[in-house]
C-alpha cells in the first residue's frame, strides 16, 4: 500500500483516510480505516486519464493527517543504515541523522538585543566592519627601509646578513617573532625584546617620520564614515609610533579601534590581529572586510573567516588573485562592492569545517623475506 500511496501522491492529489464501520459474521460492528484517493481513472481512451472527483469527502479527525510516503521511505533507509557496522574502520555512508533546518541560522542575528529593528539591521548586508592595514594601504610604503633596518641590525649584532628570501618571509611579522622564529638570532626573551626595540629605532631613523597618504585613501575612509561603517587600524608597529603617525596626517578620528604590536602575540600570517580587531569592533568575523597589500594578509584574513580586499601597491595584481577583490586604489571601491562582499550568502551560512580523524592503524609491512640457498 505504501508504494501505491507514494505513486498516487506524486500525481499531486493528496489521499485521505476515511473510517467506515463493517459487520462480520458474528454481527459485531468493527471500525476500519481505508484510504480514498480523490482521482478517477479512465481506461476507455488510448491513454490513462485522471480526473478530480467532484464529490466531497467527509472530513473527520483522521482526514487532516497527510500520508507521509517520503517519511516511510526515509524510515526504510534509516533501518538499512542502522544495520551497517558502526566501527571506525567503516566509511560513513553520508547520511546525516541530525535534522537540518532551513534557512540556516544567521550568525549575525543577536536575540539578546530584544529589538527587531536592530536585529533586522544586523542581518542585512549593510552591517559590516572595515579593518585596514597601515603601510601600503593607507600610506605609501617603502619596503626597502625595512630590509635596510634588518641588515643594519645584523651588522650591529655581529650576525650574518639575512638573505632576500628570509627578508620576504618576515614581512608582516612582529619583530620579536621574526628574530626568534625566522632569523633565529636569540631565544632569550630579554635579548629578543632588546633587538626588536633597536630595529624599530633604526627604522624610525631611516624613515624620518614623514608619512604620506596614498591616492584615494582619504576619500574612501570619508565615504565609510558617512555611511556609519566602523573602521579599525592594525599594524605590527609599536603603539607609540602608530599613534604619532596617525595623528600627524589627521586621520585619527576615522578609526574607533587601533591594534598595535603590543596587543597581540603573533603577526601575519596568523589571523590574531584581525580577530582581535573584530572583537573590539563587536562584529563577527564573517562580517569584517580586511584591506591589505600582501598574500600574507589574504591568508590571515581567510584563516580568520573574513573577506579580503587587496591593494596592489607593491605586488602586481596577478599575484593577489586569492583575494575577493583586487584594486590599485581604495577609491575604486564603492559601498555596493562592500555590501556584496558582506552578503549573508557567503561563508556565513557554511558549516564550520572539522578536522578529520587520522587513521592510526599500523599498516602491514610490504617487505618480503627470501631464504638464501
From Swiss-Prot:
Enzyme class label: hydrolase
Pfam families: HAD_2
Gene3D superfamilies xrefs: HAD superfamily/HAD-like, Putative phosphatase, domain 2
Cofactor list: Mg(2+)
GO cellular component term of the entry, any: chloroplast
pH dependence: Optimum pH is 6-8.
Keyword Hydrolase attributed: yes
Enzyme Commission code(s) on record: 3.1.3.104
Reactions this protein catalyses: 5-amino-6-(5-phospho-D-ribitylamino)uracil + H2O = 5-amino-6-(D-ribitylamino)uracil + phosphate
Subcellular location: Plastid, Chloroplast
Coiled coil: none
Alphabetically ordered keywords of this record: Chloroplast, Hydrolase, Plastid, Riboflavin biosynthesis, Transit peptide
Main location: plastid
Molecular function terms, GO-annotated: 5-amino-6-(5-phosphoribitylamino)uracil phosphatase activity
Gene Ontology annotations of biological process type: protein phosphorylation; riboflavin biosynthetic process
Temperature and thermostability: Optimum temperature is 40-50 degrees Celsius.
Function: Catalyzes the dephosphorylation of 5-amino-6-(5-phospho-D-ribitylamino)uracil, also known as ARPP, but has no activity toward flavin mononucleotide (FMN).
Family in the record: Belongs to the HAD-like hydrolase superfamily. DOG/GPP family.
Oligomeric form and interacting partners: Homodimer.
Protein name: 5-amino-6-(5-phospho-D-ribitylamino)uracil phosphatase, chloroplastic
Organism: Arabidopsis thaliana
